[in-house]
Amino acid sequence: MNGKESRGPACSFEFVGESSGLLGPGESRWPFTNGYAFATWIYIESFADTLDASTAAAAIAAASAAKSGKISNAAPANVHTGEGTAHMPRLFSFLTPDNQGIEAYFYAQFLVVESGSGKGSKTSLHFTHAFKPQCWYFIGLEHTCNQGLLGNSDSELRLYIDGSLYETRPFDYPRISKPLSFCCIGSNPPSTTAGLQRRRRQCALFAEMGPVYIFKEPIGPERMTRLATRGGDVLPCFGNGAGLPWLATNDHVRNVAEESSLSDAELGGYIHLLYHPCLLSGRFCPDASLSGAAGDEKTPYSFSAVVFALCYLVFPYFGRPMSLLPLTVSSVHKDNLEPCSRNVPSSLTTYSLAAPIFRMISFAIKHPGNNEELSRTRGPEILATVLGYLLHSLASFDIKHDRVGDEELVAAIVSLCQSQKINHALKVQLFCTLLLDLKIWSVCSYRLQKKLLSSLQDMVFTEATAMRNADAIQVLLDGCRRYFWTIQEKDSVNTFSLDGDARQVGEVNALVDELLVIIELLMGAASPSFAADDLHRLLGFIIESPQPNQVARVLHLMFRLVVQPNAAKAQTFAEAFITSGGIETLLVLIANRVNTMGLETESFQQVKVHGSETVICETGSVTLSSSVNADRISSVSETPFNNNARNNVDDRDRVMVGIIRLIGALISKGHLKFSVGAKSDVMSNLMGSEFRENGGTMFDYKVALLLFALLKAFQAAPNRLMTDNVYTTLLGASVNASSTEDGLNFCDLGHRFEHPQLLLILLRSLPFASKALQNRALQDILFLACTHPEKRSSLTKMEEWPEWILEILISNYEKDAGKQSASPGSAEEEDLIHNFLIIMLEHSMRQKDGWKDIEATIHCAEWLTFVGGSSTGEKRIRREESLPIFKRRLLGGLLDFAASELQAQTQVIAAASAGFAAESLTPKDAKAGVENAALLSVFLVENTVVILMLVEDHLRLQSKQNCAASAVDVSPSPLSLVYPPNYRSHTLPTVGESSEVSSSCASVSSDSGGVHLDILASMADASGQISTAVMERLAAAAAAEPYESVSCAFVSYGSCTRDLADAWKYRSRLWYGVGLPSKTSCFGGGGSGWDSWKHALQKDAQGNWIELPLVKKSVSMLQALLLDESGLGGGLGIGGGSGTGMGGMSGLYQLLDSDQPFLCMLRMVLLSLREEDHGEDSLLMKNLSSEDGITGGLQCPLGNSASVDISSQLSMRQSPSALLWSVLSPVLNMPISDSKRQRVLVTTCVLYSEVWNAVSKDKRPLRKQYLEAILPPFVAILRRWRPLLAGIHELSTGDGVNPLVVDTRALAADALPIEAALSMISPEWAAAFASPPSAMALAMIAAGAAGWEAPAHPAPPAPPPLRRDSSLLERKSTKLQTFSSFQKPLEAPNDDTPGRARDKAAANIDSHLLIQPLTRLTGVFWKLDSMESSSRMRQCLRRNYSGTGHLETTRNYGDQTYLMNNHDSPVLAVEAISKEIMYEDDEHGDADDLEIEGNVGERKGENEERRSGSLEDAITLSTGINDHRPLSEQNMVQNSTEVKDLSELKERIVLEISSTMVRPLGVVKGTFQITTRRINFIVDIREDQHLDEKSDGSKSRDEERDRSWLMSSLHQIYSRRYLLKKSALELFMVDRSNFFFDFGNTEGRRNACRAIVQARPPHLKNIYSATQPEQVSRRTQLMERWARWEISNFEYLMQLNTLAGRSYNDITQYPIFPWILCDYVSEILDLSNPSNYRDLSKVPIGALNPERLKKFQEKHSSFEDPVIPKFHYGSHYSSAGAVLHYLARVEPFTTLSIQLQGRKFDRADQIFSDIAATWKGVLQDMNNVKELNTTDPNTHMVSSFSNPTTSETEPDSDMNIVSTPSNATTNQIDTESSEAANYENSNSSIKTSKNTSKITKLTPTSKRSLTSSKDNAAQKSSTKPKLLSKAEIIKVDVYSYIMSL
């Protein structure tokens, strides 16, 4: 079937030599005047059987010579002149009677064309193509003749072979004018015309020839190509063969026929003769040309011998290719003829024939007939069945071998599919059934499956269209999931375990890799239009597939598509990924990895076989056959290639790696970016309003959500998700590394932190990761940050710096809580973190204002320790304890750096000075050069001084906390922003504490202690009375400056903290003459002694002061700053010393010559000297170089080897007293000026306080060395500044004694230091340095120091929602902006409240109440109060001072405005007063009084005006204290029995969640916070939304402020719906206020309710902890109590409304009461008549009227809409409009109703005005099915019900009037046997009971006004209505309610 003969036409003419040929008719004229064309298909058996070698050589030479033009045209014909030597089989001959014409013949495999004209001349042309025998050729000859204008012609001869133009040669066309007499094809000319070869033997043709086309003119290359392409089997569609091709049944043949018909239409005019073999009949073949079919006079060709047509391809008609398939099947089932395997040898034999048979079929189907037959007989399905049988049978019989290892079968199948060229649909079907169906091949060996997939990869380049049409991507993905699984699924086929063997995981993964390569090639070869669909398939696959190996590889495939070199395609795939839901898919994958990663091991187990292989077995069947596996391993087919594939086992983190790589690629390519700006902290504003405020799109939100989900996934499962591979990938994506497979090359300088979003995820995840990973990450990031300044800058400029690294440090310390020792590696990690921070901050130390970075680092640590995190208990304590430890080590490291750097800068500046001096510059230029060189030193010194102040801040704070450590914290609250210095402001002495310590502690924190009784007794006269002058002095002494205001100016830390407080109180009173000792008693100092001092210090494990290493480092830094190597003082050029080489640095001099830096350095030096003196040898400087090992870190020493070396160098300098002299040198050397008085006065006060506390109370020097060090400079200052200080008269005591005026031994030149110190211990000296001038100067300096320590806190910013790891507090935001802020104290806060405003507040209210009834008789407005009674009645109205008549809503608004403008009323003054009171009134909220017991409606004073508000605001108004803390924190009184355990007082945050407070007039968004003691609602000011700027007339302040409720105030909880979602809770308090909160979803509501219940509110009854209405109703026995008449009808209905979810707070679901009565027409209403009651069994209300109900049913049945479902009622029985219809007359519903009606009341039906008419409308109107809604059923009891004038709808109507039914006017209601209406919950039926009581009748009136007259409104508002008795309420409550409306 694959022979050469089969490639030609199916039918052909056979020429068998001289006895055969075609003889054609002649023509009366020469038909080829313009040229000719000849075309045919020919198969030549032999060219020259007798041709010798010489003849062949001559022919080849002749052809070559003819091509080169070196031989004449006649030469080829004269090659041989011998007789019978030339064999030239003719192709055709066209001759005239005189032998003129054209001939073509073969000469030794070359085609020769000869032409002859008159006079015997002839020419010939040899073509160079060598034809081969026994091969089919399409030969076309075309001779053109183009006649010129002048008779010249341009002729050429063309040769076509197989449709292509092979050769074109110039050849003159003969001019022939004679008729055509002889036409011969394949035979000799007749004897009468021997032709052009007369001298040679006539040679016939031995060949087969297809159809013969003779054209009478050239047809051109294009037509010749089409003629060759359609083949020789096509019969033209004209002549006798017309219509035959249309018998085709497949598309291919039909398309070919259509194309052929078009070609025939073009060729029909050119053709001269056409004879087709299929038309042969006997010895004659008719002419099939157009002229022959038309009946032209032509004689058909006749054969000179028997000629017959042959058909070589007999398959389409005799056996078909499918007949070979039975040879591949050994046996079949007899019942269904399905193949089966019974005999192994026969099966193997038939299998060996499979590949050759498939190849034979591939050749056979090339023929159109076979192709059509294969389609008709469903060949692809049959082939697939046979192939599956072959593979399964062989696999079942060949277990011990490599299953199916014959790759020839794969090649045969591939050849079969590729051989199909003419029928594309059949090819697609073959691909689907044979190649793409992995089920057939799944039983094969790994090698054979890989061969198949590799073949498919190669076929993508040639068969992409067929594979695309076969939907190869989806088919392969489905097969991948079903057959290449690692986790068993329901739909997966376990074909790998037919023999019980296990699969190799590596082989499965390798096959998946090969399969995805096919998909990648298909996607790359497709047009961009297919990208979206292909990616959608991939995304759907990874969403649904639980196979982690497949998901990871598909993600890697997407990554390769996005980062491919072709930028256009990469862009297309990236955009398609995003638009096809790629971001959402990644979100799902992240969530799945968090939830299911730990469950993967439950589905399969990995078993090591022989120590090297990993296989997969189903759970519960892990047993492996050792023999089978041994055979598999030792099999010959198991090559090293298989072994390498088995090592292709995934890590468990490959999915996360794929996600991160894909996200990183999309970010790096610019596809995932924010349009709202480059913010690194994208997660902090994720769920907030940042995106909306900054114009963010939904795409920005999705990108941020993706990054947020990735972060939360790492935090939720760090050990499983944050692995080494994931970390490397994430860090590589952050720096945009090209590849991270082999790790990151940190030496590559091209790495930059280009993607801060990904870096932020990594940094925020590190606190949750393992310590090993933390160490690695810190080292890597530090290395990257240090390799380039840009990296360091980008890292430090992140908003999260340094929060993430501090959180690592603090969280690790927190995790070690409760452990005996630190975790392994904690010390190393802590060292690494501190080194990281110090290296980063060292760079800031060299920059201007670099101290801001240090300050921000410390503030961040403070925020993290006290606010950050969510830990409680011991872990929270550990977290707070880490702050001082961190500060010590950080500040100590920076001080070490500063000391060493200052030394280095000294040498730099000195070298620069020497260089400028050597250049002989002018002094001015040299000075400028030195200052420029010293600029870095200026920045360094500035930052160093700030560090010193931070150290002092730390020491002062720790001292205060240590002093208060033994006290009890009464009520700490997380809502307080005050951390330093009043962290524990409320202190009480603990049990067992000494009175001395207790009093000292109390004196530190407060100055409220009075004068001792002994002092008062000493100041009394003989009669025991205290004179007025003495009392004035006592009062003045009590008003002296408290210690808190001056403490920061002293050295108020260390061992003398308590002594300083006591001394100041005592000495400040001495100046007023209070507490003067008697003359006989000894006047001593303030030192409390060594025991007290040691007790005041916080000790480490070795018993040393824990702050001592930090003090030592501060001293070392000051020595490097102020002293030179010789130890001489006078740094900065002061005092003659060179200092650190800073001569000429005026900037540094001015820097340090300011109050705050100077005094800070002085206090630190004094501290070091004081703590050095322990009554023995010096402790501070003795072992400075070797005693640096005191614990200063969390788990490791504070110092390191570098600091020890620095300390060793600095210890060579002189004693610390030299440092004190250097610090005080500016004061000693500066000119005496009054401008420096404050600094000098503060310096002397500080020095004297140290002298005072170094002397004991019995006047003994306790610290002699300290006194010897500080007295000389102290005395020197006093001597120098004595003239100025003596001029301060206020320094004198009450007796007029100024110690600086008189001569004293203390200032004597020969006085020893101890002697001088003891001389200063006197009342005069003590009082002088605590006098008012001294106190004022100290207070100003202390304000500056305290301002640095504890700046004023602004209002806390709104917290970012949905961030559980943060609280409502944000970091300390007030920072010093410039260094100059140290040089002046902070300004005191302004108190805008006048001094007497507190007293005037109440007076304004009372005077307003008195004046108002006299001056404002009109325009009184009211609004409904939210206070409820015990039965939930809202029966109180309160004045609405900001109310309005809403005149703008009326039609005659212009006229009323004119009248109002011309109305003279003396109310202007009152309006001003009311405006002032308005603020006071509206400051109050809904929770008026926190009464828990009693009726809130009953008040003692009936004339007392109720003002809405809260006690917090009342206290604020009356006291003028601007404290934003809740009332519970300011003035909370607790029962002493409740304070049982101090740990219970520790308040912590339990839950924070975004929520919305729903109010009738507005919706306020904020954060709902639950702590262990409170429920807080913090308003988000930016999100605050109100329905109107004026709620009921004004903007209510209580809607905007934060709220806080104690847990003890909670009484009930109910679940609610809001906006048709079950997402809300309503809280009912013990004070009968209620609040409605919406949490957005059911989960949020559930979490909030659970958190509240778990907090165990004491007054929350157990029955209300369950929020299901049925449970609450059953537990409370609501219906039973109503049936027993224990509760009224109203209370029962309100309880039902409450349980049903109706609330006063939501206007869309307001409480409703049903209509009860149905008779509103009768004059007398008989309550005993059942017909007067509504039938409550017919619900809803639309079913009451049968006629209307029938209309509703007809409407329902006839309604047809494709979108809207059928419905009965077009409105709801209780909507917002229906509620406001009834309640529009009372605020705040008036305002709401106006807003709903578009601010116009212009229709009469907009407001409820007639009871009877309303009932009629409810009963008959098709659009009215309203039930009754009410503000409160007992509102009729309040006389002033509504506003005087609301609006007017009609000129003659009054909207304040409501018409009542006529039976309401009767004087008597006979109720002898009347029955009261009661409701039963079960069937809503009415039951009656006898009533024997009489009821007073109402006053008759036709219409009853619901509002009182304007004249007596105020009087009636204070009148309490008469209440009915209990029995009367039970009987007629419902009726009274209906009648009152």
UniProtKB/Swiss-Prot annotation:
Stretch forming the signal peptide: none
Gene3D superfamilies from the UniProt entry: BEACH domain (1.10.1540.10), Pleckstrin-homology domain (PH domain)/Phosphotyrosine-binding domain (PTB) (2.30.29.30)
Domain BEACH-type PH residue range list: 1544-1653
Domain BEACH: 1667-1941
Acidic residues: bias regions: 1481-1492
InterPro entries: BEACH_dom (IPR000409), BEACH_dom_sf (IPR036372), BEACH_Domain (IPR050865), ConA-like_dom_sf (IPR013320), NBEA/BDCP_DUF4704 (IPR031570), PH-BEACH_dom (IPR023362), PH-like_dom_sf (IPR011993)
Gene deletion effect: No visible phenotype.
Comp. bias regions, Low complexity: 1874-1897
One GO location term (cellular component): plasmodesma
Sequence ranges of Basic and acidic residues compositional bias: 1496-1510
Biased composition (Polar residues): 1829-1848, 1856-1871, 1898-1920
Subunit-structure text: Interacts (via BEACH-type PH domain) with GFS12 (via protein kinase 2 domain).
Function: May act as a negative factor in protein storage vacuole (PSV) trafficking regulation and plant effector triggered immunity (ETI). Negatively regulated upon interaction with GSF12, and also probably by BCHB. Required for ETI, but not for cell death.
UniProt protein name: BEACH domain-containing protein C1
Phylogenetic placement of the source organism: Eukaryota, Viridiplantae, Streptophyta, Embryophyta, Tracheophyta
Gene: BCHC1
